[in-house]
Structure formats: C-alpha cells, structure tokens
Amino acid sequence: MKKALLLLALAGALPLAAAPIPALERRGQAVQLIVDGQPYLALAGETANTASSSLEYMDTVWPKLVEMRLNTVLVAVAWDWVEPVEGKYDFTLVDGLLAGARQHHLHLMFLWFGSWKNGISSFVPGWVKADQARFPRTQIKGGKSVEILSTLSATNLQSDTRAYVAFMQHLREVDAAEHTVLMIQMQNEVGLLGDSRDRSAAAEAAFAGPVPPELTGYLQQHKDTLWPALRHRWQDAGAKAAGSWTEVFGPGPATDEIFMAWNYARYLGSMTAAGKAVYPLPVYTNSWIVQPEDKGPGDYPTGCPEPLTIDVWKAGAPAIDLNAPDIYLPNFNDWTGWYHRPNNPLFVPESRGDIVGAANAFYAIGQHAAIGYSPFGIDDTSRLVALRPGPDTGAAPPATLGNQPLPRAYALLAEMAPAILDAQARGTIAAAWLNKEMPAQDITLADYTVHVELRRNRRDPTQVPAVGYAIVIAAGPGEFYVAGLDVQVTFAPNTPGPEIAGLARVEAGRFTGGRWQPGRILSGDDILLDYDLAGAAAKNQSGSGLRFRGDGPAVQRVQLYRYR
C-alpha cells in the first residue's frame, strides 16, 4: 500500500518536473515568456473589467475570442469576488474561468483587482470599504479623504496580501500542472488621483522623513542608466545619499510623484513577493500613461510606473518582473520605446483592437521584442472596427470576426511565431509602423538599410493608405522575411561593394510548423514600384521592391544580390 501511494505521489510530481511553470527568461538578446519549456508569443486580449464576474456571460465570450485568433485572455479577479466575507475564500469563479479557457484551448493572465483599480479602491470587499478606521484612506489637500486606500497602512497591505496569497495558493493547487495561467497583473493602474501626493498625517511624516537608503543606494548604483529626468532631478539637488524627499529630489510635484511611486512600489512589491513564495508566476504592473491634457501628477495617477519613476519601481519592487504601459495614444512607437529598457521587457496589456491595434501588435513584437500585445475590452467586438478609441467606439459590432484587421494580423503572427521568437533572441528582427503623418521609415538590419513606406499607387503616388505596418527578419546573407500590410519595401546595402540591391528571388508563402513553405514566385508587376528606372538608378535603386496590399497582411521571402 505504501509503495502504491509513493508511486502515485511520484506520478503526480512528474508533470511539474517535466514542464516548469511559466517564466520569463532571457534568451539571447530578448527576455521571453517561456511556457512548457518553449518561447511563447502572447496574442492576447483583455475583457472588460467585470466581464469575468459572470461565468454565464463568459460562456458567450469564449467562442468569440477563439474566432478572433487569440491564444491568451486577460481577465480580472477581484478581491471582493473571492473574499466577500473576511477570512472566507470562494474560488468558484476562478475555477470556472480556468475551465472555460481550457475548454477553448486558451491561456489566461489573471488581473488581481485588489486595493486599487484605475487608482480607486472600487474592487475591495464591502467589509473593507465600510471600516475606514481599520482600513485608512488617502487624503488630498483640504484634509478630504478619497476612496483610495492608503499605501502606508500595514492593515491594508496585510489584508490584501492574505487574499492574494490564498488566490495564488489555489492557482498552484489547480493549475501547477496545466499551466493555463501564464502571468499575473498586480493591481490595475495604481496611483493617486486628485492630488500630487497623499496629505494624511502618516504621509506627511513619511515625506518629511528620510528617503529610504534602498532607493538612494539604487540611484547611486545605477546612476549611468537612470531615466534622464530622474537622474537630472536627483543630481540637480546634489545627488545626495541621504535626506528628506525634498532635500534629495528638490521641491515640486515631481518629487511628490517620486514619493508616491516608492510607496506604491513597496506595497505591490511586498504583495508580489508573498505570492511568489507560494507560486512564482511572472508578475507585471500596468500604467495609466500621461495624457496630453494632463497638467501634472494627480491628473494622471501619481505614483504609477511612468517613465520618470520606473527606476523607483525597480528599486522598491524587485519582485515585479516588468512594468507595462497601457497605450491608447497615437504615438505608440514613442511609448513602447520609453518602456522597453534593458531591465524592463515590453508587454502591452491594454491598447486598441482595430487596424491601428494590428499595426501596434506588429511594431511592439517586431521592434521591441514584446512578449505580447493585448487590446482592451475585447469582448466588445465593435473595438475591432473602432472609429475612435475609448468606451464609445463609434462603430457597430462586425458581422464576422476572423477577417477583421487584428484577427488577421494575429493569424499571421501565430503562423510566424517560431521565426519571430527566434529572431527576437538573435536580435535579427525589426518593425515599421506607418501612417500619413509618418509615411516612411528606414530600418538598419544585417548589412542593409530596409526602407519601408506606405504603399503607393504607381500612377498616382499621392494615393496612400491610412495605416501600414511591417516586420522584417534577417534570415541569412542577403535573405529576409518581410510580413506586412499596405507597405512597399526596398533594400540598400550599407557595406562596401556594389551600391544597388536587386531582387534575385521573391516568394510569397507561409510558415508551417516553423518552416517556410514557398508559394508563388513574384516578379514583374508584383514587384515593380517605379516606372522611372532612370530616376531610381540615380538614387541607387532598382525600381523594384516588395509590395504588400491592403486586403490582409502577408509574408514574403526575398533573396538579394548586389550590382552597380
């Protein structure tokens, strides 16, 4: 009997030994999400905040997500939903979400809506909301309390942590072998709204007190790589190793923001470490980024991991794996560059789901080795054809889902995922994101400058599409795979030798099982970009290049040769 029990126990342990839980690992030049031992590209979408509170509602959503070509879904789990009565946990909803995802062959990332969601404590249990004496709030100027739990309360932290650890323990029990859940988002867009910092008595005392040595030590150790605005603020105040917050960072709202960032980082970092002690899944935060109309911290959630304060978060919350931006603004390429840092791999957990979202996904994954992309509110299918970002998309839901811009982009990215992930690790991939304000981009890759521009009508070059995008992978000497939509692509050598790059062979095709399967051999009208060959030759161009139409993203393979 004992032998049988031992064998059963060993058998139960085998899946864990054979397939480690999901993790972030550096592979070559990229940090990648590893699932069941293999790099994984998260082609994701996030449901609306309360969608996951109803399994009946989610039953109508799962099939749509499959049709949209998602492989990963971001869903909320609220503290209020799992601990409606203090000390009594109910994970029925969690188990139902796991079952729904597994039935539809989808992975999950759970969003822990605990102390804060969009800065406000709206998803905490009622027993927390009703007991302000025990669970203190933040105060703003004038002594007014707001519905935002204080970061400085040990009781707030301990209570949220207990619930979160119970949740992670449950995940370990029900998913350690299945690996349905890939990552955890810790809270949601934290930070104080309505003031630049907490004005409670506890916060005023902390602000007047010394900056923790963990932060000043981090600044000293990483002074050469700090975000420039943070480094300049610290150095302009004397680069002090000790002092009050005003003495170390100078007076002003930016110092208030740094102070709040430290407090939020310590709170979320402590929770993350406690959860990882039970079940060490990767954990990220998401950020409400500064909007053009914002005049200062407090208009956006002060303390959120903004570009200014990511270093503060790295110092205060080392257990958190990455800080991710929610990007709805048009300058997507700027924001991805500001968040993708050597110590901060890129993931975009909220963004657009229309044609702009398709371009965003290609750019983040190709240019910044993003581990994934996720438009928000994906259960509202009108977001696939949105006329404008935001809760009111201005569009009706499409009749079919799979042929919309983002699902078609996801289908091609899924097909190319092995090649993309390999190229991310090798550093042989780049991307272009184009619109009428930025109609062309040059990419330096391998021994060539790759010129990507919006696809032009050969008879009327002024006719260009509104959006175009491309991923370029260097596969060997003079060999490239290019995937894109509504762009045209030319190549120019950037090493000594003949000045003009010609197209030796161009193939349309697809990837199957990670291998290239050639289809049509493209030539003639397929690749002619410019009838003015004399003008092209004067610019060291052949007049030919790759053309990608607007009826859906496609991939081509090109082999180049050089001549003069």
Tell what function each PLM region has.
Residues 18-71:
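N-terminal carbohydrate-binding accessory modules
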Residues 106, 268-281, 308-420:
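Catalytic-core region of carbohydrate-active enzymes that cleave or remodel glycosidic bonds
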